[in-house]
Design a protein with these regions (language model features):
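Surface-exposed interaction regions that form or flank ligand-binding interfaces
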Residues: 112-128
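Generic enzyme active-site microenvironment
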Residues: 62, 83, 138, 173-174
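C-terminal substrate-binding/active-site "lid" region of AdoMet-derived donor-dependent transferases
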Residues: 136, 142-213
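A short acidic, Gly/Pro-enriched loop at the edge of an enzyme's catalytic core
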Residues: 127-136
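Membrane-proximal basic amphipathic "stem/tether" segments
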Residues: 1-43
Length: 213
């Protein structure tokens, strides 16, 4: 749901009042000029970041659509990470950071994407990159989303992810989940948790959903 600036401000105030521990991170992120990539943090809600820090360990194989600070963050904490990116310039930036951090357990792959329509997207190398089972799948990449859109690339990725996620404790993470209410109704997960809070380098409140299988 799209909010007015006034509604966003009220929601932010309510969130900070209900979760005082987010006050310090919020103001720290507000005064920094660093990006999530430079901070080595996912661009998720703060609540989701806290939760994945408790959940993730070095036995997990992770797949990620969309690269950035999350790629560095996850690579440091998992067994193996495969990340799919479609934007060449951004790919080079993230690749450079991953090499600097010596994350030898990560694979960053550049894959073409086609957003002409949903079928073209599903047939693109970007969508077809997921071809094996993973413990954790993160959906935080490119999208075809907006008030006039009839389909969403991230929703399509979610349905693909449900085919490949481990059914023995697997986890699918959907960022900016407020955009995709249909996924909360169509999930096949055993449990779903909505993490709504502030996030790194965000001016307002966002949500990141965890689907447990």
């Amino acid at each position: 749901m799209y909010l007015t600036n006034f509604q966003r401000s009220l929601k932010l105030l309510g969130q900070l009042c209900s979760s005082p521990r987010d006050l310090i991170p919020y103001f720290r992120y507000s005064i920094t000029n660093n990006s999530p990539l430079e901070l080595e943090l996912p661009w998720w809600s703060q609540s989701a970041i806290r939760e994945i820090q408790k959940h993730l360990n070095h036995s997990h194989n992770v797949f990620e659509w969309g690269s950035g600070g999350s790629s560095v963050f996850l690579a440091k904490r998992c067994k193996e990470l495969t990340t799919i990116e479609h934007h060449p310039d951004w790919f080079e930036q993230v690749e450079r950071i991953l090499k600097d951090k010596e994350t030898s357990n990560s694979r960053l792959l550049l894959r073409e994407i086609n957003l002409e329509d949903e079928q073209a997207f599903l047939s693109s190398p970007y969508a077809q990159s997921l071809q094996s089972a993973y413990d954790i799948i993160v959906i935080d990449g490119e999208d075809h989303f907006g008030p006039e859109s009839s389909w969403s690339a991230r929703e399509s990725c979610f349905y693909l992810a449900q085919e490949w996620i481990s059914k023995d404790g697997g986890l699918i993470i959907v960022d900016d989940s407020w955009r995709y209410p249909a996924l909360r109704e169509k999930t096949k997960s055993k449990k779903m948790v909505i993490h709504e809070s502030i996030g790194p380098c965000r001016k307002g409140v966002t949500s990141t959903d965890f689907h447990y299988y």
